[in-house]
UniProtKB/Swiss-Prot annotation:
Catalytic activity: sulfate + ATP + H(+) = adenosine 5'-phosphosulfate + diphosphate
Organism: Shewanella loihica (strain ATCC BAA-1088 / PV-4)
Pfam families: PAPS_reduct
Single GO MF descriptor: ATP binding
InterPro entries membership: PAPS_reduct_dom (IPR002500), Rossmann-like_a/b/a_fold (IPR014729), SO4_adenylTrfase_ssu (IPR011784), Sulfate_adenylyltrnsfr_sub2 (IPR050128)
Family affiliation: Belongs to the PAPS reductase family. CysD subfamily.
HAMAP family: Sulf_adenylyltr_sub2
Self-association and partners: Heterodimer composed of CysD, the smaller subunit, and CysN.
Spans traversing the lipid bilayer: none
Protein name, UniProt field: Sulfate adenylyltransferase subunit 2
Gene: cysD
Pathway it works in: Sulfur metabolism; hydrogen sulfide biosynthesis; sulfite from sulfate: step 1/3
Length: 301
């Protein structure tokens, strides 16, 4: 067995242990399923953790109404293929207001359709623990967040009041109304994720692989034209470029990267040479300085 396989097996074992502990410790856990590569790895780990039984908690997808069409198709196909319980929630207030990233801006769209939508779903179903696919190498606010991330009754995160985590000992004590966000992939890197996907043959949306796609260059970011709702600004033109996505979200707020990587080995090779963050394409991370930390303090993923 190679060193890399040993390393990935150690990460796998750690993540599975965390999942089993949460399933045993909490009354009503849920897994947040955003349909991306990290969610795909989480789903694979959950299936392994509880095999041959069924995953003992539902998966929750907070649908903003602006996800890539392929993401929705992939989500529904995975639910049918693996038979897990899927909860899809859309913020009804946001739908009534017809919230759009074009007319309302990325900050308001994210706050209403993502953050508020997530808090609504967690409260509606009374979940006391929620698995997420965040990793510490993604972004600086996530780098300092614990594996068990305590949230108060308003789902707020206080980065200055986090619980100590010694070795693999986690404190899951919560009072009524409080909850824990759990991040089993905290110690994984983007390269780990891709190598694990390749070794375990995990299915992912084809948006991660490069192919010619219609894009518009806006503020230095390549935005894919995914449907007829895409609003072009004066002087913009749609062009075909060989692109892929390193991260997936709402299509008007997710930048593509030019790439020739059409296979997983080519993506892994690209990652070995890459010096930029995968979240450079997330428009919401550029709303203001420390925007991600502020969003998390308000209840974001």
């Amino acid at each position: 067995m190679s060193t890399q396989q040993t390393h990935l097996k150690q990460l796998e074992a750690e993540s599975i242990q965390i999942m089993r502990e949460v399933a045993a410790e909490f009354e009503n856990p849920v897994m947040l399923y955003s349909v991306g590569k990290d969610s795909s790895v989480l789903l694979h780990l959950a299936r392994k953790a509880f095999y041959p039984g069924k995953i003992p908690f539902p998966l929750l997808h907070v649908d903003t109404n602006w996800k890539f069409k392929e993401m929705i198709e992939f989500r529904d196909r995975m639910a049918k293929q693996y038979g897990f319980d899927l909860i899809v929630h859309k913020n009804p207030r946001g739908l009534e207001m017809n919230i759009s990233p074009f007319t309302h801006g990325s900050a308001k769209h994210t706050d209403i359709m993502k953050t508020e939508g997530l808090k609504q779903a967690l409260d509606m179903h009374g979940f006391d623990a929620a698995f997420g696919g965040a990793r510490r190498d993604e972004e600086k606010s996530r780098a300092k967040e614990r594996v068990y991330s305590f949230r108060d009754s308003k789902h707020r995160w206080d980065p200055k009041n986090q619980r100590p985590e010694l070795w693999n000992i986690y404190n899951g004590k919560v009072d009524k109304g409080e909850s824990i966000r759990v991040f089993p992939l905290s110690n994984w890197t983007e390269l780990d994720i891709w190598q694990y996907i390749y070794l375990e043959n995990i299915e992912i949306p084809s948006l991660y692989l490069a192919e010619p796609r219609p894009v518009v260059k806006r503020d230095g970011t390549l935005i894919m034209v995914d449907d007829e709702r895409m609003e072009l600004e004066p002087g913009e033109a749609v062009e075909q470029k060989m692109v892929r996505f390193r991260t997936l979200g709402c299509y008007p707020l997710t930048g593509a990267v030019e790439s020739q990587a059409t296979t997983l080995p080519e993506i892994i090779q690209e990652m070995l040479l890459c010096t930029t963050s995968e979240r450079q394409g997330r428009v919401i991370d550029n709303d203001s300085a420390g925007s991600m930390e502020k969003k998390k303090m308000e209840g974001y993923f």
